Amino acid sequence: MTNESEVGVKKAAELLRQGATMLEEACPICKMPLFKLKNGDVVCPVHGKVYIVKSDDEEKIVKRNLQLDEIESILIDGLYLSAKKMKEDPLDSERIVQIIRYLDALERLRKIKINSSE
């Protein structure tokens, strides 16, 4: 048994102890069984959260949503760092403009997410 599969088996056992349900589907990457957590998430013991899609269109939607979430996270991190730096010099006009751009980008991104879910 390889080291990766040993770790996967140990994580799978831990998931079962925590009340997860083993599913008949397998991870498309490592072929380990998938588990459904109590909160409804489907996870691979090796790779973490897995999204099960039934069609190519559904796969595109999931990928797009994941990318939008990642972009949103990056924007929020940048906004946080800019706001933190602004405490050092509250009158820095370039920093203020940068914060406004982050807020504008976040607003646009959220509108895209709302429109794409309709």
UniProtKB/Swiss-Prot annotation:
Phylogenetic classification of the source organism: Archaea, Thermoproteota, Thermoprotei, Sulfolobales, Sulfolobaceae
InterPro entries with a match to the protein in the record: SSSCA1 (IPR009563), UPF0148 (IPR022954)
Organism expressing this protein natively: Saccharolobus islandicus (strain M.16.27) (Sulfolobus islandicus)
Family designation: Belongs to the UPF0148 family.
Superkingdom per UniProt: Archaea
Pfam families named among the record's database cross-references: Auto_anti-p27
Protein name in the entry: UPF0148 protein M1627_1409
